[in-house]
């Protein structure tokens, strides 16, 4: 509908409106790591009605980063991918500099590992990092992690250009 017909906006509104306006194919899109009270039941109903996959943080914690990464890769396939990374995906213990800190997020390691496992080799056409609020973090650990996240995305683009399409895990399984 038109902007005047839309309900009061919340954090998920731009994504929903992009689907309503035909800018995003919900069947090839996925949202991961949501937690807290920022989304309404209507938002989840809308997502389910339109085939938009979403994985709540609690489900990610239970299934693990690798399984979550596999679902992301399966969902987007070889299609062009625009990645929006919201820093409040990360637990405020590791990234307190955000306007909406909610406990129960992910560690710095889990965050970087998800980025590497899920996005290596994808047809990424754009990336943005949102919700970093330096004034809420005098320790600057949020900015340190945010800069590392941007570094990882740039490295993934370079790897893709070099023909590297799989994340080379160097540890023991």
Regions found by a protein language model. Give the residues of each.
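Active-site environment of divalent metal-dependent phosphoester hydrolases
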Residues: 1, 37-39, 134-136
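Active-site histidine-anchored catalytic micro-motif
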Residues: 1-28, 121
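Short aromatic-enriched loop/helix-cap "lid" or pocket-rim segments at secondary-structure transitions
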Residues: 5, 43, 95
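Short, contiguous, pocket-lining structural segments
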Residues: 6-10, 35, 82, 142
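A general structural motif
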Residues: 10-16, 33-39, 61-67, 107
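A structural signal for isolated positions on well-ordered beta-strands in alpha/beta enzyme cores
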Residues: 28-30, 128
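Short, glycine/polar-rich helix-capping loops at beta-to-alpha or helix-loop-helix junctions
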Residues: 37-49
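Catalytic cores of soluble, metal-dependent hydrolases
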Residues: 46-173
């Amino acid at each position: 509908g038109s902007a005047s017909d839309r309900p009061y906006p919340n954090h998920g509104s731009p994504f929903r409106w992009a689907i309503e306006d035909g800018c995003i194919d919900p069947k090839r899109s996925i949202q991961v790591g949501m937690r807290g009270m920022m989304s309404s039941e209507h938002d989840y109903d809308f997502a389910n009605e339109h085939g938009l996959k979403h994985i709540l943080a609690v489900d990610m914690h239970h299934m693990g980063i690798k399984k979550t990464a596999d679902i992301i890769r399966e969902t987007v396939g070889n299609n062009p991918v625009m990645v929006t990374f919201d820093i409040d995906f990360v637990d405020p213990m590791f990234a307190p500099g955000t306007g909406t800190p909610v406990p129960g997020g992910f560690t710095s390691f889990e965050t970087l590992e998800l980025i590497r496992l899920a996005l290596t080799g994808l047809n990424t056409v754009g990336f943005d990092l949102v919700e970093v609020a330096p004034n809420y973090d005098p320790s600057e650990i949020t900015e340190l992690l945010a800069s590392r996240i941007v570094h990882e995305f740039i490295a993934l683009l370079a790897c893709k250009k070099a023909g590297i399409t799989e994340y080379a895990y160097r540890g023991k399984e």
